[in-house]
Swiss-Prot record:
The gene is proA. PROSITE patterns: PROA. The keyword Cytoplasm applies. The lineage of its organism: Bacteria, Pseudomonadati, Pseudomonadota, Gammaproteobacteria, Enterobacterales. This is Gamma-glutamyl phosphate reductase. It catalyses: L-glutamate 5-semialdehyde + phosphate + NADP(+) = L-glutamyl 5-phosphate + NADPH + H(+). It comes from Salmonella paratyphi B (strain ATCC BAA-1250 / SPB7).
Length: 415
């Protein structure tokens, strides 16, 4: 089955690569319209997925990721329309010039070809990835988690209907709707057809892909994100940032999981933090110093292993550190190179933090929640890469392209 999907996807990618920006935008507009027109069928499938997942004991954080509402589906359709408004990078000349040999050389952006994406209980990913791949002239093979297989199947049918209506091959967007996990291992070996693989899931999935895939893999999306409260931090705005970073949508990978507090501000800051977290319904997981805090927030002892895990819930590690060195060392040991922030009024400390924390996104006096394709002005994102090759941070349109060198001559030969 996968062999035939790969053959069809590769054939479709050749046709997509030749489309103009206008032709690609018309397809995206049609997809957005069809998502709204077929909302009832998609939501009906999603209800079945959510009910099954709840019966299987899926966590509330994962159920939140899985669930669609009319408002969420409308927002997904609007995101597709936003992709239409983004500049098409395909065909863009990156650089070039006339060489001494007389050869005119240019480096031009081109589609990758076929992209494979493996993801879990995130039905929005189906549309986000499909729209970005189509905008950049790529075909895509999707493998969502078993929790979303009804929703994904319904969504892909809508997308394929739009493709067909626009005279394009339905194989431009395909989904592996069989929940058999053995198919993942088979997909990892499809380097003959898939040019890049993006796993969006937990550490286990990423490890499997890195170890077993014969396809170039871009990993990311695991966010053990930190905020360091420096000794010079202004407490009131610092608390506002922390509340946003923890509570706006706890199930996301850019949510803060560990708060590092400079010991010189701890005595003044921690009581205010406890009060604010109690109002926000956040449970604090504190180290020995924090456990001595008497405040209204729910407080439990921090377990060492929690420093390396995503809570994806209203839980927050709080650790008091001796100084900036301690904060940076902690992030290097426990961070996932996703998003980390410093709250400070000392711009020298801010500059040092930015230079020494090796994460895809580093913030000064701002929430980690900004690490997102839409917030960065990239449109919907395929993933947030925490590696350094071929892309880093939110992966927008350019991350779905490569380049080719093109030489123009006039009977030009090498001397």
């Amino acid at each position: 089955m996968l062999e035939q999907m790969g053959i069809a996807a590769k054939a479709a990618s050749y046709k997509l690569a030749l489309l103009s920006s206008g032709e690609k935008n018309r397809v995206l507009e049609k997809i957005a319209d069809e998502l709204e027109a077929q909302m009832e069928s998609i939501l009906s499938a999603n209800v079945q997925d959510v009910e099954q997942a709840r019966a299987n004991g899926l966590s509330e954080a994962m159920l939140d990721r899985l669930a669609l509402t009319p408002a969420r589906l409308k927002a997904i359709a609007d995101d597709v329309r936003q992709v239409c408004n983004l500049a098409d990078p395909v065909g863009q000349v990156i650089d070039g010039g006339l060489l001494d040999s007389g050869l005119r050389l240019e480096r031009r952006r081109v589609p990758l070809g076929v992209v494979g994406v493996i993801y879990e209980a995130r039905p929005n990913v189906t549309v986000d990835v499909a729209s970005l791949c189509l905008k950049t002239g790529n075909a895509v093979i999707l493998r969502g988690g078993k929790e979303t297989h009804r929703t994904n199947a319904a969504t892909v049918r809508v997308i394929q209907k739009a493709l067909k209506a626009c005279g394009l091959p339905e194989a431009a967007v395909q989904a592996i709707d069989n929940p058999d996990r053995s198919l993942v291992n088979e997909m990892l070996r499809m380097d003959k057809y898939i040019d890049m693989l993006i796993p969006r899931g937990g550490a286990g999935l990423h490890k499997l892909c890195r170890e077993q895939s014969t396809i170039p893999v871009i990993t990311g999306g695991i966010g053990v994100c930190h905020i360091f409260v420096d000794s010079s931090a202004d407490i009131a705005p610092a608390l506002k940032i922390i509340v946003n970073a923890k509570t706006q949508r706890p199930s996301t990978c850019n949510t803060v999981e560990t708060l590092l507090v400079h010991q010189d501000i701890a005595e003044r800051f921690l009581p205010a933090l406890s009060k604010q977290m109690a109002e926000s319904g956040v449970t604090l997981h504190g180290d020995e110093t924090v456990m001595q805090l008497h405040g209204p927030a729910k407080l439990v002892p921090l377990k060492p292993e929690e420093l390396d895990n995503e809570f994806l819930s209203l839980d927050l590690n709080v650790v008091v550190v001796e100084n900036m060195d301690g904060a940076i060392a902690h992030i290097r040991e426990h961070g996932t190179q996703h998003s980390d922030a410093i709250l400070t009024c000392d711009m020298h400390n801010a500059a040092r933090f930015v230079n020494e924390v090796d994460s895809a996104a580093v913030y000064v006096n701002a929430s980690t929640r900004f690490t997102d394709g839409g917030q960065f002005g990239l449109g919907a994102e395929v993933a947030v890469s925490t590696q350094k090759l071929h892309a880093r941070g939110p992966m927008g349109l350019e991350a779905l392209t490569t380049y080719k060198w093109i030489g123009f001559g006039d009977g030009t030969i090498r001397a």
